[in-house]
Swiss-Prot record:
Protein name: Inosine-5'-monophosphate dehydrogenase
EC number per UniProt: 1.1.1.205
Chain's gene name: guaB
Top EC class of this enzyme: oxidoreductase
Cofactor(s) annotated in UniProt: K(+)
Length: 496
């Protein structure tokens, strides 16, 4: 029985075990389409940032969404702080600013100036006690007025150019240019102020034509939630997050599967998607799809900072895990995210060829400006802090979300009295500058691979790409060899 179990064990593969075979191709890399659809979340690049406290907070989520990807804000923080971060992403590129700072017509000019200086703005809508727009006051209106006790209503511009809520961005821009104004108040049918559009915000949005946005034109953002944390999920739903990622080391725990059903019920009537992970088998995929998962996240122990495979002896090499889950997921039209083990851009191509619809990145993004990890200098070179959510630091820091993720979650207040068994390590990764530079190289490598494989888009990549298994000698041959590298390439860091 036991010997048979060993003999019949299947061989499993990860990224370094295979290469993609070049095909006859009419496809140029520059002409490839790398967009993907995660159950209705339309991304222009197949990159999702990891829900780790040294990878994704609002800065990373904003930057990645502007590039066309998706950030998953980690949960090792209070519910209130996570909600605040989600809202910050949503407001970053809003077309219509809803939380408008206003003044009353009976306020003094001095009071209006104080408000402008406090919030560093050069103009304010003027509304009456019914929130009806009656005028606008700007620095130009007040800069020559010496008597600061004058009323706003005596100096404001009363003939205000405004628009209705359904105004299109192009129409708003034309109105502002035609009337030489930089702010366009938005009003309802009764002239009540709803919000404001600014020229600066429209021009800023146009800098990011590939941004991943919701139906209202706001940046997409996801947030992590514990498998039993219904209170957090409720708050995230109210914050209008685009996806909730059930963040768990072993999502095929049957209590987690049962809770997925409850989370799915909470999301009824919303457009919010439920991402569930992590898993590594077809059985897990079947159970979680049945429970209501919209997107599956694959990966047990492949991450650079994860020790699950040596501490627990459990895991499946990532490429095999992705392919096995994909075979089930594709039957149900459920997309999957390959989470972990990605070291080079070629690994992204291999993950997609094996059935992934997107990849989740941790270490490749942790060294960027937008990652929240601490910047440090080691031997004269810059690094940024990076740690696994199963590390002792993540388990005991913040709100102890790392411990909860690995089913070692007492109340945070009792953490100091509990012995923990970490499944991750803490360290540092080389500083890399802005995340946009890293993403440029990663997507460039993916496009190159698609050109070699003759795939115009990711669906064709999954259909046309072919694998070949390589030997250890083949792995050595795949990397630069018989040379001392004197200039480090941006997409091939030394020391890996």
């Amino acid at each position: 029985m036991f010997l048979k179990k060993l003999i019949e064990a299947k061989k499993a593969y990860t990224f370094d075990d295979v290469l993609l075979v070049p095909n006859a191709s009419w496809v140029e890399p520059k002409d490839t389409d790398v967009s993907t659809d995660l159950a209705g979340l339309k991304l222009n690049i197949p990159i999702v940032s990891a829900a780790m406290d040294t990878v994704t907070e609002k800065e990373m989520a904003i930057a990645l969404a502007r590039l066309g990807g998706l950030g998953v804000i980690h949960r090792n923080m209070s519910i209130e702080e996570q909600v605040h971060q989600v809202q910050a992403v949503k407001k970053a590129d809003e077309v219509v600013i809803k939380d408008v700072i206003t003044v009353s017509p009976d306020d003094t000019v001095g009071e209006a100036i104080n408000v402008m200086e406090t919030y560093s703005i050069s103009g304010l809508p003027v509304v009456d006690n019914e929130d009806k727009l009656v005028g606008i006051i700007t620095h130009r209106d007040v800069k020559a007025i010496e008597d600061k006790t004058k009323k706003v209503k005596d100096v404001m511009t009363k003939d205000v150019v405004c628009a209705k809520e359904d105004v299109e961005e192009e129409e708003a821009l034309e109105l502002m240019y035609a009337n030489r104004v930089e702010r366009l108040p938005i009003v309802d049918d009764e002239n009540r102020l709803i919000g404001i559009i600014t020229l600066r915000d429209i021009l800023k949005r146009r800098k990011y034509p590939q941004a991943a946005r919701d139906k209202k034109g706001r940046l997409l953002v996801a947030a992590a939630c514990g498998p039993h944390d219904f209170e957090r999920a409720k708050a995230l739903i109210e914050a209008e997050v685009d996806a909730i990622a059930i963040d768990c080391a072993h999502a095929h725990n049957m209590r987690v599967v049962e809770n997925v059903k409850k989370f799915k019920e909470m999301l009824e009537g919303t457009d919010i998607k439920l991402i569930v992970g992590n898993i590594a088998t077809k059985e897990a995929a079947e159970d979680l799809i049945k429970a209501g998962a919209d997107v599956l996240k694959v990966g047990i122990g492949p991450g650079s900072i994860c020790t699950t495979r040596v501490v627990a002896g459990v895991g499946v090499p990532q490429l095999t895990a992705v392919a096995e889950v994909a075979d089930v997921a594709k039957e149900h039209n459920v997309p999957i995210i390959a989470d972990g083990g990605i070291r080079y851009s070629g690994d992204i191509a291999k993950a997609i060829a094996a059935g992934a619809d997107a990849v989740m990145l941790g270490s490749l993004l942790a060294g960027t400006d937008e990652a929240p990890g601490q910047l440090m200098v080691i031997n004269g070179r810059k690094y940024k802090q990076y740690r696994g959510m199963g590390s002792l630091g993540a388990m005991t820091g913040g709100v102890g979300a790392g411990a909860d993720r690995y089913f070692q979650a007492p109340a945070k207040s009792h953490m100091k009295h509990v012995k923990l068994v970490p499944e991750g390590v803490e360290g540092a990764v080389p500083y890399k500058g802005p995340v946009s530079e890293v993403v440029f190289q990663l997507i460039g490598g993916l496009r190159a691979s698609m050109g070699y494989c003759g795939a115009k888009n990711l669906k064709e990549m999954q259909e046309k790409a072919r694998f070949v298994i390589i030997t250890p000698s083949g792995q050595v041959e795949s990397h630069p060899h018989d040379i001392i590298i004197t200039n480090e390439a941006p997409n091939y860091p030394l020391g890996k």
